[in-house]
Curated annotation (Swiss-Prot):
This is Protein Smg homolog. Belongs to the Smg family. It comes from the Bacteria. Pfam families: DUF494. HAMAP family: Smg. The gene is smg. It comes from Neisseria meningitidis serogroup B (strain ATCC BAA-335 / MC58).
Amino acid sequence: MTEVIAYLIEHFQDFDTCPPPEDLGMLLEEAGFDTMEIGNTLMMMEVLLNSSEFSAEPADSGALRVYSKEETDNLPQEVMGLMQYLIEEKAVSCEQREIIIHALMHIPGDEITVDTAKVLTLLLLWANKSELPVLVGDELMSALLLDNKPTMN
């Protein structure tokens, strides 16, 4: 799914410029992506479209997020640290963080990594046309690189 999201971010200016899901699915298939990866990405995009009514305002970085047992069992400590960092840097709101965590909890446990969390964060911010501080954006974009080579065509 990470590579599909990276492809979308590289090839479309924003969420609104993407073709309808059926056409996008065919386009991604023609680009050589796996059908299951395409389906998972389209599902995530649908969730984002349906959650567009939240506030994109940065949260008070002093707020404390308590993770449930299920979340602590599934989310690596590094991912929880990334979520706190993004809140502290005012890169995401509390609502956006919750959407990211919700999305991560629907991914198989062995696929939940810091890079996956970064890419899902980028997808969410891209969908909301959010501006990012340069250093935070660079940190998130690093997840789209594999061995210093772009994962996108």
